[in-house]
């Protein structure tokens, strides 16, 4: 499945992909990643992630970002980005990007893209997504959503 599991808030990307990249990574997108979006990730969105949303939620924090916590949640931080943490959450960072972390989370970086990480996370890279992931844009790619009104409250499968 791509996009998210609740049919809403695709964010700047969707699916298992990452912001400007691909894979189980992170950045400005949704899915297992983090940043601005939804899914198992964090940032602004809903689902198992945290930030301004619901689900397995996060710890202490404010704004669209995540708070301090671990496990399915996010680490310490604020804004659209993720904070410091581990496990399914995100690492340390701010902005639309992801912070430093490992596992299902993201690596170190900022902006719309992804940072440096390991495990199911993504490495350092940018560009318009590929594979199951989507890139930043007002169109659909690989059966997923880009950023745009038509993206919200829809779900797609591309894996």
Curated annotation (Swiss-Prot):
Any coiled-coil regions, as ranges: none
Keywords: Keratin, Repeat
Domain of life: Eukaryota
Tissue-specific expression: Expressed in skin during two hair growth cycles. Expression restricted to the cortical cells of hair follicles, appearing first in the cortical cells processing the flat nuclei located a few cells above the dermal papilla.
GO cellular component terms, semicolon-separated: intermediate filament
Region (66 X 2 AA repeats of G-[YCGS]): 11-147
Subunit structure: Interacts with hair keratins.
Similarity-based family: Belongs to the KRTAP type 6 family.
UniProt xrefs under PANTHER family: KERATIN-ASSOCIATED PROTEIN 21-1-RELATED (PTHR31294:SF8), PTHR31294
Functional summary from the UniProt entry: In the hair cortex, hair keratin intermediate filaments are embedded in an interfilamentous matrix, consisting of hair keratin-associated proteins (KRTAP), which are essential for the formation of a rigid and resistant hair shaft through their extensive disulfide bond cross-linking with abundant cysteine residues of hair keratins. The matrix proteins include the high-sulfur and high-glycine-tyrosine keratins.
Name of the molecule in the record: Keratin-associated protein 6-2
Source species of the chain: Mus musculus (Mouse)
């Amino acid at each position: 499945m791509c996009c998210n599991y609740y049919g809403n808030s695709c964010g700047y990307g969707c699916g298992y992909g990452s912001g400007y990249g691909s894979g189980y990574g992170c950045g400005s997108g949704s899915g297992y990643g983090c940043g601005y979006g939804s899914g198992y990730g964090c940032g602004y969105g809903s689902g198992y992630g945290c930030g301004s949303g619901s689900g397995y939620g996060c710890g202490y924090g404010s704004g669209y970002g995540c708070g301090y916590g671990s496990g399915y949640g996010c680490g310490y931080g604020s804004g659209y980005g993720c904070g410091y943490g581990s496990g399914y959450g995100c690492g340390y960072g701010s902005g639309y990007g992801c912070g430093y972390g490992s596992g299902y989370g993201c690596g170190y970086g900022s902006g719309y893209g992804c940072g440096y990480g390991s495990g199911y996370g993504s490495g350092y890279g940018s560009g318009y997504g590929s594979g199951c992931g989507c890139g930043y844009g007002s169109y659909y790619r690989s059966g997923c959503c880009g950023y745009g009104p038509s993206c919200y409250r829809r779900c797609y499968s591309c894996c």
